[in-house]
Amino acid sequence: MDEQAGPGVFFSNNHPGAGGAKGLGPLAEAAAAGDGAAAAGAARAQYSLPGILHFLQHEWARFEVERAQWEVERAELQAQIAFLQGERKGQENLKKDLVRRIKMLEYALKQERAKYHKLKYGTELNQGDMKPPSYDSDEGNETEVQPQQNSQLMWKQGRQLLRQYLQEVGYTDTILDVKSKRVRALLGFSSDVTDREDDKNQDSVVNGTEAEVKETAMIAKSELTDSASVLDNFKFLESAAADFSDEDEDDDVDGREKSVIDTSTIVRKKALPDSGEDRDTKEALKEFDFLVTSEEGDNESRSAGDGTDWEKEDQCLMPEAWNVDQGVITKLKEQYKKERKGKKGVKRPNRSKLQDMLANLRDVDELPSLQPSVGSPSRPSSSRLPEHEINRADEVEALTFPPSSGKSFIMGADEALESELGLGELAGLTVANEADSLTYDIANNKDALRKTWNPKFTLRSHFDGIRALAFHPIEPVLITASEDHTLKMWNLQKTAPAKKSTSLDVEPIYTFRAHKGPVLCVVMSSNGEQCYSGGTDGLIQGWNTTNPNIDPYDSYDPSVLRGPLLGHTDAVWGLAYSAAHQRLLSCSADGTLRLWNTTEVAPALSVFNDTKELGIPASVDLVSSDPSHMVASFSKGYTSIFNMETQQRILTLESNVDTTANSSCQINRVISHPTLPISITAHEDRHIKFYDNNTGKLIHSMVAHLEAVTSLAVDPNGLYLMSGSHDCSIRLWNLESKTCIQEFTAHRKKFEESIHDVAFHPSKCYIASAGADALAKVFV
């Protein structure tokens, strides 16, 4: 029966509990089979199809979220990279622009120096090949310059580290001794002729010419005496110290080529200025000029030979070839040595003092170096310096101090500066020199200590051009009159941060509204409690000024408006207030000037020019030197002085105008000097003229602007005049010298008009300007 058993039998035999269930009945076997099926179903429930789908959906959603976060992060990083790249590009552009500016300024400075030298000495200043700066090559070589800069930086750091090591072990003194010995060998104090000539040949190969070696040898033989050798030792120690100076940037850049620098050039560059500064030295050296002259003829034949042969020929053939008495030369040399010793008793200091001197020299600013071409004209060798040596002056200075540094040990820095050969006034030449076109010298002018005015506030609330402005006599308060039919009052101490800049803006604290047309003029009383305005409506409105600290949003106060002064039938162009009599002067397009009593609203006290004999008045002012007089300008070009008490015209100022008036002779403004009997007029033909009130004669006339002069103002002390013009400029003038001491552009043009009015504050440090661009600007 076992062969025909079903699958359950085999499964039961394989089960661990099959033996126990085998002897049981059918019920037990059914129960056991049911338990096995339940266990298998529980195991399969963990991986059901809905569960798997849910898991996949959950993982997909998490993956999508992470990918979205990654995309956002990548976008942020890309934006940051783009921002940094843009910032880097902007910095590079800024650097290029600054480099171009530096090159431009360097080129301009070289031109100015050459021009100054030509004017002073009448000769061209040899500055090498001076070409205008080129910018295209800089951009092309930018990629090549960066690796060089990195290598130069590493080279400089390595030199700095090596310098510290040498200083720690005390090797600096050894270098000084070795170099001093080498200099003595080069200058002919050593008996090793072969080594000396080898050095000269090596120097000549570096320089590309052999004539310089002979020239240096001749100069050294004729000039170096005992005291001169002491000074040369000083100079050599200076050059050694310059090797270890942090200030020598050129030496760091060209450090790899330092070993092949032309030492003969160093000796010659130092010997020439020192030997050329003493008159006795020049006279003594003139005795040896024939040596140099004879040597010039042999340059060509000697250039192909060996350096050692030259020296031997010089030593052997000197007496025969030149036919000179050697005793005379020896006598001259001894005499020259005695004179030098008598003049300069220089004792060589010990090493510690010398090191202190060198340390002090590092703290002092480097003295200006001399071009070899500026040397004494009596020295033939000075004019025979090769051109490429002059061009390499900066490169040579990487190993040396300036030519006069040896004298600075003895004379001091200031005296050494004054004794620079041929330098003269060039010692004071700086980049800050003013242009030659200026007609005045600021340095010698007593205005050098004057105040410089700078813009402080921009008043922006008007909707049309501002025609006039007036300061409060005491408070920092300004009133402006505009073509938008309003006047506005500004407290210059109540500032608020501007919206789009770091500057401060001022908001108006009160707006005066009563005019029915553009307001053309405004004036304040002497105590600042009232102000008066005139406009195209022919009315003169009187106002009570409000408290400067008033809230701009307070309710309307009807007591501010005092009422109009009626009488004019056309636009009122100008007003002037008399503090002595509390009177108000006005001039109108109806051709009349009127005098008003400001204490009451009544008809005018007096009327002037009612017949329009002089034309239409354009401006009026009180004569400060005589309170009973007033001065007025007219459209026909006349300026007259009137007596307000007698109502008579007492004087007409001198004017060269035709009877047929035209726009070119129009006078836009007349003012009176606060302390002197002088009247000043601003003309349409760009002139400013000064008149004597006593005689009516013209004192001075000058073209002050590029376009019509529209406004004038004199400071309370009577020292400076301010003028405004339609050329958009404000100019400040010294009344004593009649020269412009400051100019600034304040406004933009509108309908070919720019600046309408300017004013000084009577007691505080403010000036203001009114423009056709609806802006008023305040300067401090």
UniProtKB/Swiss-Prot annotation:
Chain positions of WD repeats: 461-500, 514-553, 567-606, 662-701, 704-743, 750-780
Record GO biological process: bicellular tight junction assembly; dendrite development; locomotory behavior; negative regulation of cell population proliferation; regulation of signal transduction; Wnt signaling pathway
Biased composition regions of type Basic and acidic residues, renumbered to the chain: 299-310
Organism listed in the record: Homo sapiens
Protein name stated in the entry: Striatin
Caveolin-binding: annotated segments: 55-63
One Pfam family in the UniProt entry: WD40
Entry similarity comment: Belongs to the WD repeat striatin family.
